[in-house]
A protein has these predicted regions:
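Cleft-lining beta-strand/loop regions that shape enzyme active-site pockets
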Residues: 7-10, 18-24, 29-35, 42-210, ...
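Short acidic, Pro/Gly- and aromatic-enriched capping/linker segments at domain boundaries
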Residues: 221, 226-230
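Conserved functional hotspot residues or short segments at active or partner-binding sites
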Residues: 240, 258, 262-276
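Short, acidic, Ser/Thr-enriched surface-loop or helix-capping motifs
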Residues: 234
Length: 276
């Protein structure tokens, strides 16, 4: 983060971190009793990885300023990054957990399956998706949008690079995208592109606001320098970093509502209006 801390963007669904209750926005202060900051990110990541069955103790500062320690048992994480189903009113639902090496291919297969079932609309769930590979989100946006701007980057020399979709394929169904405070980076590229191109209604909470390309320059054994090399902008020129994507329909978290997903319920309500 800007103040040199290591922040949790969003724990991977089904991961040891999610299971013990680590949340988006939590600050990792220590690992196995040793203090860490963003300049020692690579070492921190190494400490958290390792053999299945090993224990690691993570010291967390949560959003309310409370310090907690969590003991995690390391386990392999091989998430299938895309899942889909048909929900009420014959609405197609696709959840993207993160953007990894085969996510765009998985998205295509899941959408083709839903299309065969003649769904009337599509809800894309990007909640708690921390991002991932930019080429994968560009591919998915290209599958969804007709010829349009997806995102552009601007570096310190004011050089812009534009990413656009072509006319080979597009999804013409009514669409709703679900986001929350754990939707970051590549998730914000996709939701921003669909919002600016008026291809989907965005429902949920303000997103995380991670819109920079960064690298760590190692400075010997004692630390490193975090370099921001470029920034992402939505097609309409909105800054993502530090701001996030503002939903068209705001719905607060469902955490305190027993067995009810109020954000998904609102997305379905919005979709019903679209497919009347």
């Amino acid at each position: 983060t800007e103040n040199n801390t290591i922040a949790v963007v969003s724990p991977i669904k089904g991961s040891p971190a999610e299971k013990v209750g680590i949340k988006s926005g939590d600050i990792i202060e220590s690992i196995n009793g040793k203090k860490y900051d963003a300049k020692h990110m690579e070492d921190a990541v190494k400490q958290m990885r390792g053999k299945a069955g090993e224990k690691v103790v993570i010291g967390i500062l949560d959003k309310n300023g409370k310090r907690k320690e969590y003991t995690l048992i390391k386990s392999p994480i091989h998430p299938q990054t895309v899942g889909s189903k048909v929900i009420e009113n014959n609405i197609g639902y696709i959840q993207i957990i993160s953007f990894e090496g085969k996510t765009a291919e998985e998205f295509r297969k899941n959408y083709e399956d839903l299309k065969k079932k003649n769904v009337k609309g599509l809800i894309i769930d990007l909640r708690s998706n921390p991002g991932g590979l930019v080429d994968q989100v560009i591919d998915i946006a290209d599958q969804i949008l007709p010829r349009a701007s997806i995102v552009y980057t601007n570096n310190k020399n004011d050089e812009k690079e534009y990413f656009n979709s072509d006319e080979k394929e597009s999804i013409t169904l009514p669409m709703v995208v679900l986001v929350n405070e754990g939707s970051a980076s590549a998730s914000e590229i996709l939701s921003g592109a669909l919002q600016d191109n008026k291809a989907a209604t965005i429902v949920g909470q303000q997103t995380y606001g991670k819109g920079v390309i960064q690298s760590v320059l190692q400075m010997g054994d004692d630390g490193g320098l975090i370099l921001t090399t470029a920034q992402y902008f939505t097609p309409n020129g909105h800054i993502v970093h530090g701001k996030g994507i503002t939903p068209d329909v705001k719905v607060e978290s469902s955490q305190n509502t027993k067995n009810k997903d109020v954000q998904l319920e609102k997305a379905i309500e919005v979709m019903k209006d679209k497919i009347k």
